[in-house]
Amino acid sequence: MIGGLFIYNHKGEVLISRVYRDDIGRNAVDAFRVNVIHARQQVRSPVTNIARTSFFHVKRSNIWLAAVTKQNVNAAMVFEFLYKMCDVMTAYFGKISEENIKNNFVLIYELLDEILDFGYPQNSETGALKTFITQQGIKSQHQTKEEQSQITSQVTGQIGWRREGIKYRRNELFLDVLESVNLLMSPQGQVLSAHVSGRVVMKSYLSGMPECKFGMNDKIVIEKQGKGTADETGKTGKQSIAIDDCTFHQCVRLSKFDSERSISFIPPDGEFELMRYRTTKDIILPFRVIPLVREVGRTKLEVKVVIKSNFKPSLLAQKIEVRIPTPLNTSGVQVICMKGKAKYKASENAIVWKIKRMAGMKESQISAEIELLPTNDKKKWARPPISMNFEVPFAPSGLKVRYLKVFEPKLNYSDHDVIKWVRYIGRSGIYETRC
């Protein structure tokens, strides 16, 4: 399994080092530094093989985490461990930085001792780890036998992600549906490719060991598994979404999801990601960009861009930014926009148009005259696509939360006693229109 774990700063200095197998030596540390961190060309692959040794690495800010092995391991499992390790460190001391790692190096070694056992990942659930590993170290001397038995049952039991005895004065549940819509559109308005990547993030402040049930859009259609079809959902008369693939938090009972298409679970305490999904059909495109580029001789371009919002008039889009690329030999730009502010940025070779807010079913436009320097280059301007950033208060996939129910029979509180909040946020991913 994992032979060793090393954490480096941007200079290649080792901040944390833990070796689990005898076949990993000091030369592995230097090999990664020379071939990856100090490489002449940027290393794009997350897996690097050097002298029959595999280095699985991720980067957070200026910090490198590298898992090293000489065995044929499951790559997905190693990366899942590395990302989990990043999440655990973030939960304990916030931002992953060189200063924070140096200030908490004892804590990190304690966490590694619990998370990895002889190179095999064991327990990476933050809630369980926080019961006996704190910022001050392992709480062992002042614990009663009862507290120690609770920790043991949580770590080794079926519900390792939640401890017993949690109590809140007010029971609250926050649900965020966060989506990123990606688009590539032709100049004529034809959709060349589009997909939505979504996450359902939950913040749970519930007493006891509550049972939660979560439902969306009548039914989820998982096409690849073939367990639901569009015809099946059409009988209900309600719109449903077709999800291409999805993954769930370990607390979700997958057997019930397969048989009943209901998401039931006992949630961890605090914030966690309930599910992640991807869809490519029936996407609501929040904006359409209509470009018009006209060449006036060899030293002038006229550009006109219209953006149209395609959602309900009662909703407001925010943080709108349109980037219109310009040729490398641009000497000057004159811009006129109906709404917002526009500025030519020579360092980025682009006109950046910003609008604070825009209601649904509206349109706005920008016109620009671009002066060009004479050039001997016979190659035509490639016309890079116009890109757009925005944030809208709905899910572009069409996903809607139908119900969110909570049951806690032991503490005698019901679904009506829980305060629930649901929020939808749609953001642009790579949202481009060719011109």
UniProtKB/Swiss-Prot annotation:
Keywords from the named record: Cell membrane, Coated pit, Endocytosis, Lipid-binding, Membrane, Protein transport, Transport
Protein role: Component of the adaptor complexes which link clathrin to receptors in coated vesicles. Clathrin-associated protein complexes are believed to interact with the cytoplasmic tails of membrane proteins, leading to their selection and concentration. AP50 is a subunit of the plasma membrane adaptor. The complex binds polyphosphoinositide-containing lipids.
Positions that bind a 1,2-diacyl-sn-glycero-3-phospho-(1D-myo-inositol-3,4,5-trisphosphate): K341, K345, K354
InterPro entries: Adaptor_comp_med_subunit, AP2_Mu_C_sf, AP2_Mu_N, AP_mu_sigma_su, Clathrin_mu, Clathrin_mu_CS, Longin-like_dom_sf, MHD
Membrane topology: Peripheral membrane protein
Pfam families assigned: Adap_comp_sub (PF00928), Clat_adaptor_s (PF01217)
Source taxon at top rank: Eukaryota
The UniProt record lists the keyword ATP-binding: no
Family: Belongs to the adaptor complexes medium subunit family.
Name assigned to this protein: AP-2 complex subunit mu
GO cellular-component term (any): plasma membrane
Subunit relationships: Adaptor protein complex 2 (AP-2) is a heterotetramer composed of two large adaptins (alpha-type subunit and beta-type subunit), a medium adaptin (mu-type subunit) and a small adaptin (sigma-type subunit).
Subcellular location: Cell membrane; Membrane, Coated pit
Domain MHD: 170-434
Alphabetized CDD domains for the sequence: AP-2_Mu2_Cterm (cd09251), AP2_Mu_N (cd14836)
Biological process, per Gene Ontology: endocytosis; intracellular protein transport
Gene3D superfamilies (UniProt xref): 3.30.450.60, Mu homology domain, subdomain B
